[in-house]
Amino acid sequence: MTKPGVDQRGRAKEYIGLLHQEYDLYPHRTVLDNLTDAIGLEFPKELAMRKAIVTLKMAGFPEEKSKEILDRMPAQLSEGERHRVALAQVLIREPKIVILDEPTGTMDPITKIDVKHSIMHSRDDIDETFIVVSHDMEFVRDICDRLALMRGGKIVEIGKTADVLAHLTEDERKVMSQPPA
């Protein structure tokens, strides 16, 4: 990763999992397919089912619910369940670093709490690094143990979450406390 040039591209890709704010599940594929075949993972069916169940549990589903939803289509799931399946889609690849881009986006408060718990559960379960990109300071306060504050596209402070949040300007607090548009 330290060597420049086009032939060195993609070397870190296998170590990083990324969940975009506007994640997408394949609407005409089952949850099991969304966690395996649809993202290029080829497992024998029994192994695929086992790995999917374990990964869904990491994303916050109870074991019985994990088994129950494998044959469902994304439209048959709630918004929070779809988000957890999308998180599982990232986790099933066993990344060393998980990047979550605005994981709560425009969610309602109940779904946001559900997603917060699933992220915390998976973070504790796999014990890997999670990087959360968010303007939702309440969410950041609840989920992050360290924080990097950016202004104008540059990191200006890194430290314990409470310490960094204490240095927000009044204007930043106002902007970050507003619900997403």
Q: For each predicted feature, which ranges?
A:
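A short, surface-exposed alpha-helical micro-motif characterized by mixed small hydrophobic
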Residues: V140-D142
